[in-house]
């Protein structure tokens, strides 16, 4: 066989199909425009709408090399020759053009004539009832019948990629590597055997059907071809390698890993696993970060975090003591940057984010591994780790569950995942409760019942803030009632409403619902099921019956303030992407009349200069008084536009686009100002971290900004008077005061230390003797923490050998203690154990090592008892 480099194979494939009339397209993003998928998992994913028949193809023949990512078999990566997280898929696609005959013929032609793979080493498989494909292989390609296998749905049926979508029977091509070492029946080995001898290198899917969520099949509008050829596998077999990691795709990456760790590949099997894991995950990490994904605790960010932490763990197995991925990522970028220039463009970002995540995990991993190893030793031959321990490793040490499972599986131990999930859900529920948000159980039975006869509520609030409607239904608690009285808290339903229901981060409208004999305050408005909107109200006056007509009136002042903040949120999102980078993605938002909150993916705090730039950019758009243009498009049209959207959200077939000139364009169903000038003024109050990889900006607009400025003005005026300074002198004046305070605190510490050490010589001269060791116990008062510890140090030095126990009572009746034990004496008495026992008696806690410990307690009145009975607290 002729040797081809990976670059040549990729280029030859695309050129071959270009010659066959295919349009060559660049790889689509790893982040699909598909709410069912976290990542692009196959070459056909970007073309799902075309396969479905929802979108007409611009080209009926397309060829691509698509970057893909899968993590469903992550535990196998490194342990097998062919499992990967990131991989490339070569593809040729036909949308209602050619079908089985041409697809099979061209696959064979490329493999045997272009790449020169020996025909005798190739086998084919077809779906068990696909006689047409079988006959093409037999009669047209001339493969011997015994080399054409019929398989069932598990092997030779592809799709859908997600819960629903296009699918169909497929035909696969296998390469015979001749590797029979693992085969139990070498003479009769075929691709049906899973020994690893035969490698699937090509899959032609005859996409003829659509599968719904129940697995029901219906014919697609046209018959299509979807070819997926594993690039890594083709490179390996073309280059005469059994293992993908031995191909030139991984050569430089593995060489760099060997250089960093001083290890050799293919010498030690367990080290080979770690080398392969790091090589594979480095590619995935580089591509994910280049797509703007940041490590976090959910979604795509969680996958990235898992990959980095799994790579770090395998680095630690190769004796890494700190971050090491940077130069490996550099090698990945150098190797693949020519094909995927986004890697070169985002190189600094890739290395920065990876380094920060590595550094963070290295800080906790050693303690986490120590904790896990201790737990394993104490399992006493049990084969299941309690879920609460796995949760502790996740919550305290940052160990993703699958990493804990992988480490334990190496020792034959499982995890109680049910208990882990219960604890995780409990933590999330506590977080939800702490948020104070009104929660609706959309699955409660009464909502399921009304869903059967109520139609979706029409929202008319884009154009109207009031309307007269007929009450369709009244719910009180969990029951439908015919009427309700003053003081009742009920839910009202109408065919139409001007009240905005909470969604997309925007809070619901407030207001009133009334008629001549009835008045209710609107507390909350929420869509419950299938766009049916519930109005939670408190009856202030009178009573209400089913079928009555009432007037619905939105609080206009609150609505207008909310609109200002919502439009400002769009401006903020775009400004962040312009100032910080396009990796910024919305991670959440809260838009209310009083303020706005915007959560976004980013790996470090914003600088003051960046915050100023963002504020300036937004206020510049406000001053321009730009019209806010709102229009409707089909979802597929919107996806092809330069529009910001959370495509993992579920949108309808028609979407609403909010456009602010060329500065911002987002999919949004919320309410907005008609002109940016209405916002008035935008001011950032705070920028903070809410979780790893996610930051939050809180801001205000309009009159709230004016009130804020007025309040600051008042504070500055008062400060100026208090300091007897002009405003521009205030910073210098405060700096001078702080400097004076710092100097005085230093003097106080020195005086405290002098007073504390005054009696040291006397204490050292009259120690107690316990079990042959000198012990000094004393109580001091109101010492600074470092003075307290230093005093104990000096006292032990004076003592020479023995134990020093110093209590320090503060003004708030709390007590702290320091225990110091000389090295020789630590064989008899343990400082940490002494501190723990005393602290427990004093109603507190603490501890430390054999020679030094600190603790505290709340029962200062018990210190005297401890001193009098110190023998009882001396622990080995």
Swiss-Prot record:
<dbReference type="InterPro" id="IPR018162">
    <property type="entry name" value="Ala-tRNA-ligase_IIc_anticod-bd"/>
</dbReference>
<dbReference type="InterPro" id="IPR018163">
    <property type="entry name" value="Thr/Ala-tRNA-synth_IIc_edit"/>
</dbReference>
<keyword id="KW-0820">tRNA-binding</keyword>
<dbReference type="InterPro" id="IPR012947">
    <property type="entry name" value="tRNA_SAD"/>
</dbReference>
<comment type="similarity">
    <text>Belongs to the class-II aminoacyl-tRNA synthetase family.</text>
</comment>
<feature type="binding site">
    <location>
        <position position="566"/>
    </location>
    <ligand>
        <name>Zn(2+)</name>
    </ligand>
</feature>
<dbReference type="Pfam" id="PF02272">
    <property type="entry name" value="DHHA1"/>
</dbReference>
<keyword id="KW-0067">ATP-binding</keyword>
<protein>
    <recommendedName>
        <fullName>Alanine--tRNA ligase</fullName>
        <ecNumber>6.1.1.7</ecNumber>
    </recommendedName>
</protein>
<dbReference type="GO" id="GO:0004813">
    <property type="term" value="F:alanine-tRNA ligase activity"/>
</dbReference>
<feature type="binding site">
    <location>
        <position position="668"/>
    </location>
    <ligand>
        <name>Zn(2+)</name>
    </ligand>
</feature>
<keyword id="KW-0694">RNA-binding</keyword>
<feature type="binding site">
    <location>
        <position position="672"/>
    </location>
    <ligand>
        <name>Zn(2+)</name>
    </ligand>
</feature>
<dbReference type="InterPro" id="IPR002318">
    <property type="entry name" value="Ala-tRNA-lgiase_IIc"/>
</dbReference>
<dbReference type="GO" id="GO:0006419">
    <property type="term" value="P:alanyl-tRNA aminoacylation"/>
</dbReference>
<dbReference type="GO" id="GO:0002161">
    <property type="term" value="F:aminoacyl-tRNA deacylase activity"/>
</dbReference>
<keyword id="KW-0479">Metal-binding</keyword>
<keyword id="KW-0862">Zinc</keyword>
<dbReference type="InterPro" id="IPR045864">
    <property type="entry name" value="aa-tRNA-synth_II/BPL/LPL"/>
</dbReference>
<dbReference type="GO" id="GO:0005524">
    <property type="term" value="F:ATP binding"/>
</dbReference>
<dbReference type="InterPro" id="IPR018164">
    <property type="entry name" value="Ala-tRNA-synth_IIc_N"/>
</dbReference>
<dbReference type="GO" id="GO:0005829">
    <property type="term" value="C:cytosol"/>
</dbReference>
<dbReference type="InterPro" id="IPR023033">
    <property type="entry name" value="Ala_tRNA_ligase_euk/bac"/>
</dbReference>
<keyword id="KW-0547">Nucleotide-binding</keyword>
<comment type="function">
    <text>Catalyzes the attachment of alanine to tRNA(Ala) in a two-step reaction: alanine is first activated by ATP to form Ala-AMP and then transferred to the acceptor end of tRNA(Ala). Also edits incorrectly charged Ser-tRNA(Ala) and Gly-tRNA(Ala) via its editing domain.</text>
</comment>
<keyword id="KW-0648">Protein biosynthesis</keyword>
<dbReference type="Pfam" id="PF01411">
    <property type="entry name" value="tRNA-synt_2c"/>
</dbReference>
<feature type="binding site">
    <location>
        <position position="570"/>
    </location>
    <ligand>
        <name>Zn(2+)</name>
    </ligand>
</feature>
<dbReference type="GO" id="GO:0000049">
    <property type="term" value="F:tRNA binding"/>
</dbReference>
<dbReference type="InterPro" id="IPR003156">
    <property type="entry name" value="DHHA1_dom"/>
</dbReference>
<keyword id="KW-0030">Aminoacyl-tRNA synthetase</keyword>
<dbReference type="InterPro" id="IPR018165">
    <property type="entry name" value="Ala-tRNA-synth_IIc_core"/>
</dbReference>
<dbReference type="GO" id="GO:0008270">
    <property type="term" value="F:zinc ion binding"/>
</dbReference>
<keyword id="KW-0963">Cytoplasm</keyword>
<dbReference type="InterPro" id="IPR009000">
    <property type="entry name" value="Transl_B-barrel_sf"/>
</dbReference>
<dbReference type="InterPro" id="IPR050058">
    <property type="entry name" value="Ala-tRNA_ligase"/>
</dbReference>
<dbReference type="Pfam" id="PF07973">
    <property type="entry name" value="tRNA_SAD"/>
</dbReference>
<keyword id="KW-0436">Ligase</keyword>
């Amino acid at each position: 066989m002729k040797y081809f480099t990976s670059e040549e194979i990729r280029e030859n494939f695309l050129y071959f199909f270009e010659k066959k009339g295919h349009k060559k397209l660049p790889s689509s993003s790893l982040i699909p425009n598909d709410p069912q998928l976290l990542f692009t998992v196959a070459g056909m994913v970007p073309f799902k709408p075309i396969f479905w028949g929802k979108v007409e193809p611009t080209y009926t023949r397309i060829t691509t090399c698509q970057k893909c990512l899968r993590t469903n078999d992550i535990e196998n990566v490194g342990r097998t020759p062919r499992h990967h997280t990131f991989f490339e898929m070569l593809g040729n696609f036909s949308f209602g053009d050619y079908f089985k005959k041409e697809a099979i013929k061209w696959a064979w032609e490329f493999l045997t004539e272009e790449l020169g793979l020996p025909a005798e080493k190739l086998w084919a498989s077809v779906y068990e009832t696909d006689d047409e494909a079988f006959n093409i292989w037999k009669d047209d390609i001339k493969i011997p019948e015994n080399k054409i296998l019929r398989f069932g749905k598990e092997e030779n049926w592809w799709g859908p990629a997600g819960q629903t979508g296009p699918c169909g029977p497929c035909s696969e091509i296998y390469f015979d590597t001749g590797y029979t070492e693992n085969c139990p029946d070498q003479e009769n080995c075929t691709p049906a055997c899973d020994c690893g001898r035969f490698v699937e290198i090509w899959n032609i899917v005859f996409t003829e059907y659509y599968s719904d969520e129940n697995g029901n099949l219906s014919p697609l509008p046209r018959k299509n071809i979807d070819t997926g050829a594993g690039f890594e596998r083709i490179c390996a077999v073309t280059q005469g390698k059994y293992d993908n990691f031995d191909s030139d795709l991984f050569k430089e990456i593995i060489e760099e890993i060997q250089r960093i760790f001083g290890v050799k590949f293919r010498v030690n099997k367990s080290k080979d696993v770690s080398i392969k894991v790091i090589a594979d995950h480095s590619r995935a990490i580089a591509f994910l970060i280049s797509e703007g994904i940041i490590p976090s605790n959910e979604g795509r960010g969680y996958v990235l975090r898992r990959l980095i932490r799994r790579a770090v763990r395998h680095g630690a197995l190769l004796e890494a003591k700190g971050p090491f991925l940077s130069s490996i990522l550099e090698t990945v970028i150098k190797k693949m940057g020519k094909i995927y220039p986004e890697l070169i463009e985002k190189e600094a970002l890739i290395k920065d984010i990876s380094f920060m995540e590595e550094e963070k995990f290295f800080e906790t991993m050693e303690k986490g591994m120590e904790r896990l190893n201790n737990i394993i030793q104490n399992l006493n031959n049990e084969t299941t780790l309690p879920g609460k321990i796995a949760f502790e490793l996740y919550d305290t040490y940052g160990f993703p569950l699958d990493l804990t499972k992988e480490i334990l599986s190496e020792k034959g131990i499982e995890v109680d995942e049910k208990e882990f999930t219960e604890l995780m859900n409990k933590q999330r529920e506590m977080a939800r409760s702490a948020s104070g948000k009104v929660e609706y159980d959309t699955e409660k039975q009464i909502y399921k019942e009304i869903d059967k006869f109520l139609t979706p509520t029409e929202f008319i609030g884009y154009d109207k803030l009031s309307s007269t409607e007929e009450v369709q239904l009244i719910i009180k608690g969990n029951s439908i009632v015919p009427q309700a009285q003053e003081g009742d808290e009920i839910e009202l339903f109408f065919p139409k409403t001007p009240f905005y229901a909470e969604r997309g981060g925007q809070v619901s409208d407030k207001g009133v619902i009334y008629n001549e004999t009835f008045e209710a305050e609107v507390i909350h408005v929420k869509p419950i099921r299938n766009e049916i909107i519930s109005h939670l109200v408190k009856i202030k006056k009178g009573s209400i019956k089913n079928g009555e007509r009432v007037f619905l009136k939105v609080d206009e002042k609150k609505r207008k303030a909310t609109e200002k903040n919502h439009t400002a949120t769009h401006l903020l999102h775009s400004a962040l992407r312009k100032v910080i980078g396009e990796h910024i993605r919305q991670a959440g938002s809260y838009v209310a009349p009083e303020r706005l909150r915007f959560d976004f993916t980013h790996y470090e705090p914003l600088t003051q200069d960046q915050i100023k730039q963002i504020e300036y950019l937004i206020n510049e758009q406000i001053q321009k008084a730009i019209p806010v243009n709102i229009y409707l498009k089909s979802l597929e049209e919107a996806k092809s536009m330069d529009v910001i959207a959370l495509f993992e959200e579920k949108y309808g077939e028609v979407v609403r686009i909010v456009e602010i000139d060329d500065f911002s364009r987002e999919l949004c169903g919320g309410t907005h100002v008609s002109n940016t000038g209405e916002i008035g003024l935008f001011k950032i109050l705070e920028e903070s971290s809410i979780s790893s990889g996610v930051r939050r900006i809180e801001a205000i607009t309009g009159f709230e900004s004016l009130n804020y400025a007025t309040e600051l003005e008042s504070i500055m005026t008062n400060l100026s008077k208090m300091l007897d300074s002009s405003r521009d002198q205030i910073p210098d004046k405060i700096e001078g005061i702080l400097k004076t305070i710092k100097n005085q605190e230093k003097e106080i510490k020195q005086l405290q230390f002098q007073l504390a050490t005054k009696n040291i010589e006397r204490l050292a001269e009259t120690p107690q003797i316990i079990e042959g060791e000198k012990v000094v116990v004393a109580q001091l008062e109101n010492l600074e923490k470092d003075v307290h510890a230093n005093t104990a140090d000096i006292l032990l030095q004076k003592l020479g050998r023995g134990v020093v126990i110093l209590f320090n009572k503060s003004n708030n009746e709390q007590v702290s203690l320091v225990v110091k034990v000389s090295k020789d004496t630590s064989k008899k008495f343990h400082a940490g154990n002494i501190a723990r026992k005393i602290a427990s008696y004093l109603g507190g806690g603490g501890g430390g090592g054999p020679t030094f410990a600190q603790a505290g307690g709340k029962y200062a009145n018990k210190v005297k008892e401890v001193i009098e009975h110190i023998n009882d607290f001396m622990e080995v």
